[in-house]
A protein has these predicted regions:
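C-terminal alpha-helical cap/extension of soluble enzyme domains
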Residues: 6-19, 37, 41-43, 202-205, ...
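Catalytic alpha/beta core domains of metabolic enzymes, predominantly
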Residues: 129-136, 144-250
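Glycine-centered loop/turn motif at secondary-structure junctions
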Residues: 42, 102-104, 163, 185, ...
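Short, flexible micro-motifs
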Residues: 12, 48, 53-56, 85-88, ...
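Active-site beta->alpha loop and helix N-cap motifs at the rims of alpha/beta catalytic domains
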Residues: 2-148, 158
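Alpha-helix N-capping/helix-start residues
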Residues: 28, 60, 153, 229-232, ...
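Short glycine-rich loop/turn motifs that provide flexible caps or phosphate-binding loops at active sites
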Residues: 8, 44, 49-52, 81-84, ...
Length: 283
């Protein structure tokens, strides 16, 4: 029997702090401090090595080490690990290796195969093959702006046929896809686009994975709670105050502005790995 994760609440897709030297080594001490701070703000869980975590610029060994540090600092809160790749058997082996190295990992956030632009049938096959190999539940990550391919509504429902595929992080900006997931009821819907957070939560998303919640974390947690308590007017008022935060966070390619803001607060250096560049002064 496959255990089902509880995805309710505000999840943080973590930045990966780096030392401000040419090597840009991962700053594990800063990461641990940041995770402990964010956990105390009431977040439901974390995502390590997602797009906000600059996973594409980290080696496999670095990613595994980031996961270890995050788990150790999370205080028992669940941690999802970002996962991507084109060859399903290799991605499945990576999931197995990560779970063996870090048994406390709660699950994996898996993108559609990037760059190759497979058919929808190919996407289903890819996810099901990885799910069959994975020892942990999967969250399908629909982010066509990065992968170059949509996970269509019918495809999402086909993914739900596998018991290890339990949720979708929706960055598609397609209300029809979200509505299909909600009507079907087998996948938990997680809001993925920060600028659509209020709308997605109000329409029934059980939780959110929100990068801009590195900033004003407690307020973002409060927003989710207000909507869970059906206090829509209070949520709308709070959202009006949070919208400038989300707009600023994505004024440049993610996560450079978030890192700059956290650096100003003393949590980490604003270092990113090329081809990313530090935030401009105007941001």
């Amino acid at each position: 029997m496959v255990n089902r994760l509880n995805f309710a609440g505000l999840w943080l897709p973590l930045v990966t702090p780096m030392v401000a030297t040419p090597q840009r080594a991962v700053d594990h001490a800063a990461l641990a401090r940041l995770v402990q701070h964010l956990a105390a703000q009431g977040v439901a869980g974390f995502v390590a090595c997602g797009s906000t975590g600059e996973a594409a610029a980290l080696s496999p060994d670095e990613q595994t080490a980031v996961l270890a540090t995050t788990l150790a600092a999370a205080g028992g809160k669940p941690v999802l690990m970002g996962l991507s790749g084109v060859v399903a058997p290799a991605v499945g082996e990576r999931a197995q290796a990560l779970a063996e190295a870090q048994p406390a990992v709660a699950g994996f956030l898996l993108t559609a195969p990037g760059y190759v632009k497979p058919s929808q049938a190919g996407i289903v096959q890819h996810f099901h093959q990885v799910a069959e190999a994975s020892p942990r539940p999967l969250v399908a990550y629909d982010i066509p702006a990065r992968t170059g391919v949509r996970i269509e509504p019918a495809t999402l429902l086909a993914l739900a046929d596998h018991p290890r595929i339990q949720a979708v992080k929706d960055c598609s900006a397609d209300r029809a896809a979200a509505q299909a997931v909600l009507a079907d009821g087998r996948l938990a819907l997680l809001a993925g686009n920060d600028d659509e957070l209020l709308d997605q939560l109000a329409r029934g998303a059980v939780g959110a994975i929100t990068a801009s919640a590195h900033l004003a974390t407690a307020a973002f947690v409060r927003l989710h709670q207000l909507l869970a308590d059906q206090q829509l007017r209070a949520a709308q008022a709070l959202w009006r105050r949070l919208q400038p935060v989300t707009a600023a966070a994505f004024a440049e390619p993610n996560p450079v502005v978030i890192k700059a803001a956290l650096a100003q607060q003393g949590w980490l250096a604003d270092a990113v790995r090329p081809p990313m560049l530090p935030a401009a002064a105007a941001s």
